[in-house]
From Swiss-Prot:
Domain Alpha-carbonic anhydrase: 3-244
Name this protein carries in UniProt: Putative carbonic anhydrase 3
Residues holding Zn(2+): H91, H93, H116
Gene3D superfamilies from the UniProt entry: Alpha carbonic anhydrase
Top-level division of the source organism's lineage: Eukaryota
Binding site for substrate: T187, T188
Names of required cofactors: Zn(2+)
A molecular function GO annotation: zinc ion binding
Amino acid sequence: MTGHWSYCDDDECGPNRWPTGQHQSPINIDLGEVERKDTHDGIKFVNYDHPIQGDIVNNGHSVQMTPELRSEHPEIYGGGLDQVYRLVQYHFHWGENDNEGSEHTLGGLRYPAELHLVHQGVEDPGKLAVVGVFLQLGKEGKALSNEERVLGKLCNPETVTRVENVRLSEKLPANKRSFWRYEGSLTTPPCSEIVTWTIFTEPVTVTHDQLELFRQVQDIEKRPIKKNYRPTQNLNDRKIVHIVAN
């Protein structure tokens, strides 16, 4: 199922009908079950301070930005990753109110939104590394300043516009040394189990008005996307590791 699908639970193409497996995402992070690992090897973010530009699209399911990559590719490595991974896109998940929206949950609770920075393996392109950032309500919304300026142009499905001078570093928390790590899947069809997940423990703030702009974005049926998060999946035999880089 990579064609038509929806987030509506009652829809015949809804989350209950999506592909499944033993290592699916998202998951609930139960702090009582997490293993802590201290290390000197943190994640390295390359060219995350360099401004990038590209197309941002309403694809009918989310708002997604695909960078126009030139010589200075945003990349990540270290922190337990098995290779260098290069950014290919980032997108957002949100809910119909400020009490829900994130895909991953923490102790069963959701943040109002979640950002996914999707990276593809340079050596083995069949693998992905997704960095998840919880977005919490606050007075400061610098992390979404670029998106805030253009979301009004993306209400209709399949619309595209340009964004300039995006600094990915502004979308990351101040503390990048503490994160949860587990092996999982894409959270949308085909739900392929090819993803190494990194979820920062520290959220980034966004404003209520910014979240409201996302809720005006429409799906392919011209209905506002009130929520676009997949229900949490069973952990099964997997472990969640809390990595702290000293």
